[in-house]
């Protein structure tokens, strides 16, 4: 008798995705981040659901409702801080996941890669709208500054901004619609993640060597289920350590001041995970140019597969490309630091140089080094 997990229509999908899935025998811990992102998403949806039961999306009561959650709701404080810090861990996993893809040439699966880029944009939009909901000073001014960037779009810009705001400034209508979108987007993210997996399972996973692994596959369960369980344990350990010991470490103190349209904070800045893009935005004097650079900083990933010049897939055996990759990582850390600094000398010039270097590495240096490595190997 055939096992029910191989015959039942629903069980078969789960079986082919998580149990009998043929996986390369040599994938490292860098391949854990897909499952960790899934766990992050589940944590965010569950904690968000419980927060939404007590939150009110009205400008007069939003801030108070968050205070009420932390003070009066049973374990409300832990749910709120798990949600806030869960977002930070979500982005850490996202950046490491994308970095893994860049390093090992996983972008050579174009459908999976492009869905991944759409996922990244969607998660960033979700996180931005979530940051507005507590209606603190940084929530309000962050929403004002970032939505205002759309006014740089020629001809329709101003109308577009007022349409998004639902009025002539960030107000009650804006908060209500941001809450609506923040609630629905994670479910769209879940659907996109399923499509991401669907495309991945069409080709099978890449592996550190970049060589096709069809001749050496192992079943996903028990090998990688156990490996993913260890990753999940470490992720939850990191999250709970952050939540229970320093829940406000990654937040902005200004967000504990209720939103006041008449008082601008000295330094308006987004959450830490957007600082690199914010630094690129600020490094260009023109408003429209800055907005374009901001969008390009992420969408540039879409043309990475077209710029792959090396005869090898990953960077495992390409020391020159490895140097460039780690230079890119250092550059992104520099941009993150600059994004949190005031707009004054020497931060302006450092930000501009780091922004130029970011695009130069991805668009010029990496393809050029790929060609050089081919010629060094006489390929």
From Swiss-Prot:
It comes from the Eukaryota. InterPro entries: Cyt_b/b6_C, Cyt_b/b6_C_sf, Cyt_b/b6_N, Cytb/b6-like_sf, Cytochrome_b, Cytochrome_b_C_euk/bac, Cytochrome_b_N_euk/bac, Di-haem_cyt_TM. Its main location: mitochondrion. SUPFAM superfamilies: a domain/subunit of cytochrome bc1 complex (Ubiquinol-cytochrome c reductase) (SSF81648), Transmembrane di-heme cytochromes (SSF81342). One of its GO terms (biological process) is mitochondrial electron transport, ubiquinol to cytochrome c. It is found in: Mitochondrion inner membrane. Pfam families: Cytochrom_B_C (PF00032), Cytochrome_B (PF00033). Heme b b566 binds at residues 97, 196. The chain crosses the membrane at residues 33-53, 77-98, 113-133, 178-198, 226-246, 288-308, 320-340, 347-367. The keyword Metal-binding applies. Binds 2 heme b groups non-covalently. Heme b b562 binds at residues 83, 182. One of its GO terms (molecular function) is ubiquinol-cytochrome-c reductase activity. A ubiquinone binds at residue 201. It is a multi-pass membrane protein. Keywords: Electron transport, Heme, Iron, Membrane, Metal-binding, Mitochondrion, Mitochondrion inner membrane, Respiratory chain, Transmembrane, Transmembrane helix, Transport, Ubiquinone. One of its GO terms (cellular component) is mitochondrial inner membrane. Its cofactor is heme b. The cytochrome bc1 complex contains 11 subunits: 3 respiratory subunits (MT-CYB, CYC1 and UQCRFS1), 2 core proteins (UQCRC1 and UQCRC2) and 6 low-molecular weight proteins (UQCRH/QCR6, UQCRB/QCR7, UQCRQ/QCR8, UQCR10/QCR9, UQCR11/QCR10 and a cleavage product of UQCRFS1). This cytochrome bc1 complex then forms a dimer. PANTHER family: CYTOCHROME B. Heme 1 (or BL or b562) is low-potential and absorbs at about 562 nm, and heme 2 (or BH or b566) is high-potential and absorbs at about 566 nm. Component of the ubiquinol-cytochrome c reductase complex (complex III or cytochrome b-c1 complex) that is part of the mitochondrial respiratory chain. The b-c1 complex mediates electron transfer from ubiquinol to cytochrome c. Contributes to the generation of a proton gradient across the mitochondrial membrane that is then used for ATP synthesis. Belongs to the cytochrome b family. This is Cytochrome b. The gene is MT-CYB.
């Amino acid at each position: 008798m055939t096992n029910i997990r191989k015959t039942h229509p629903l069980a078969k999908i789960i079986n082919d995705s998580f149990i009998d899935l043929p996986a390369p025998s040599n994938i490292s811990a860098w391949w854990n981040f897909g499952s960790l992102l899934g766990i992050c998403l589940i944590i965010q949806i569950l904690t968000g659901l419980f927060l939404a039961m007590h939150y009110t999306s009205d400008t007069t009561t939003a801030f108070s409702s968050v205070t009420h959650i932390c003070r009066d709701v049973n374990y409300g404080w832990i749910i709120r801080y798990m949600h806030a810090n869960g977002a930070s861990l979500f982005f850490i996993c996202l950046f490491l996941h994308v970095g893994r893809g860049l390093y090992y040439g996983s972008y050579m699966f174009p459908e999976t890669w492009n869905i991944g880029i759409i996922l990244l944009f969607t998660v960033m939009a979700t996180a931005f709208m979530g940051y507005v909901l507590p209606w603190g000073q940084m929530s309000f001014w962050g929403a004002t500054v970032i939505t205002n960037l759309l006014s740089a779009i020629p001809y329709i810009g101003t109308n577009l901004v007022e349409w998004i705001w639902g009025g002539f400034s960030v107000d009650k209508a804006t908060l209500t619609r941001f809450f609506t979108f923040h609630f629905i987007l994670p479910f769209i993210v879940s659907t996109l993640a399923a499509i991401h997996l669907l495309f991945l399972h069409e080709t099978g996973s890449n592996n550190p060597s970049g060589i096709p692994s069809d001749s050496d596959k192992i079943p996903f369960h028990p090998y990688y289920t156990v490996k993913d369980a260890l990753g999940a344990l470490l992720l939850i350990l990191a999250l709970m350590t952050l939540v229970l010991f320093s829940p406000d470490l990654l937040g902005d103190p200004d967000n504990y001041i209720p939103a006041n349209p008449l008082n601008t904070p000295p330094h308006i800045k987004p959450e830490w995970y957007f600082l690199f893009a914010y630094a690129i935005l600020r490094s260009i004097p023109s408003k429209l140019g800055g907005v374009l650079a901001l969008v390009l900083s992420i969408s540039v990933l879409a043309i990475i597969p077209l710029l792959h010049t090396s005869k090898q897939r990953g960077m495992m055996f390409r020391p020159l490309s490895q140097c460039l990759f780690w230079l890119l990582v250092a550059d992104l850390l520099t941009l993150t630091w600059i994004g949190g600094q005031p707009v004054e000398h020497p931060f302006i010039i450092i930000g501009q140089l780091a922004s130029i270097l970011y695009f130069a590495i991805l668009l010029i240096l990496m393809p050029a080094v790929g060609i050089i490595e081919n010629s060094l190997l006489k390929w």
